[in-house]
Swiss-Prot record:
Record note on quaternary structure: Homodimer.
Encoding gene (name): apt
Function: Catalyzes a salvage reaction resulting in the formation of AMP, that is energically less costly than de novo synthesis.
Organism (species): Chlorobaculum parvum (strain DSM 263 / NCIMB 8327) (Chlorobium vibrioforme subsp. thiosulfatophilum)
GO MF annotations, alphabetized: adenine binding; adenine phosphoribosyltransferase activity; AMP binding
Name this protein carries in UniProt: Adenine phosphoribosyltransferase
NCBIfam families: apt, PRK02304.1-3, PRK02304.1-5
GO cellular component: cytoplasm
Entry EC number(s): 2.4.2.7
C-alpha cells in the first residue's frame, strides 16, 4: 500500500473548506512510518545532496527529522515555537495567511557554513519552511535541501520555495488542495 493511501483526509479542518492531510495515520502504522523514513533516507543517500545536520520544524518535523538523523548519522536541531528553548535564541516572525507567527532556534545550533537538510511533514503555503530557512541562514547555515512527506502544489508553497532557489523533495502530493 503506497504512502499516500495511508494519509487520512479530514474535511473542513481546522476550518470550513480545508482538506486537512493527517499524517498520524501514516506514522502510527509501523510499515507506513518505515516507508517514509526508508524512502527519504534512500533519496538523500542516492542523490548526492551533501548536508551536515538535520533541522526539524515543530512539531511533526521532529518525528521525521529524528528518525532521519538516526538513519543518516547526522545531528538534529529543532526549530521551536517561542518560549520552548532554554538557552539563548534567535527568533523570526513571519506572516501567515491570517496573521503572523514566530519560530526560534538556539543561537549555538549551527556553525557558520554548516549545510542543513530542513524537514517537515507537509508543504502548503511555504511560509513556515521559508521562515525556518531564513532562521538557518541568520545563524550562518546553508539550506542544502528541504524534505517533506506531503506537498500540496496547488497551494503555492513549492513554487515560492523553488523561486527562492531551494531544492525540495516530497514523497507524495495531493493536488487541488
Amino acid at each position: 500500500m503506497p504512502i499516500k493511501s495511508r494519509i487520512r483526509t479530514v474535511p473542513d479542518y481546522p476550518k470550513k473548506g480545508i482538506m486537512f492531510r493527517d499524517i498520524t495515520t501514516l506514522i502510527k502504522d509501523p510499515v507506513g512510518f518505515r516507508l517514509v523514513i526508508d524512502n527519504m533516507t534512500q533519496h538523500y543517500l542516492s542523490n548526492g545532496i551533501d548536508f551536515d545536520v538535520i533541522v526539524g520544524i515543530e512539531a511533526r518535523g521532529f518525528i521525521i527529522g529524528g528518525a532521519l538523523s538516526y538513519t543518516l548519522g547526522k545531528g538534529f536541531v529543532p526549530v521551536r515555537k517561542p518560549g520552548k528553548l532554554p538557552a539563548d535564541v534567535v527568533q523570526l516572525e513571519y506572516d501567515l495567511e491570517y496573521g503572523s507567527d514566530k519560530i526560534e532556534m538556539h543561537t549555538d545550533s549551527l556553525v557558520k557554513g554548516q549545510r542543513v537538510l530542513l524537514v517537515d511533514d507537509l508543504l502548503a503555503t511555504g511560509g513556515t519552511a521559508l521562515a525556518a530557512a531564513a532562521l538557518v541562514e541568520k545563524l550562518g547555515g546553508v539550506v542544502a535541501s528541504m524534505g517533506f512527506i506531503v506537498n500540496l502544489p496547488d497551494v503555492g508553497g513549492e513554487k515560492k520555495i523553488r523561486d527562492k532557489g531551494y531544492n525540495i523533495f516530497s514523497l507524495t502530493e495531493f493536488e487541488g488542495d
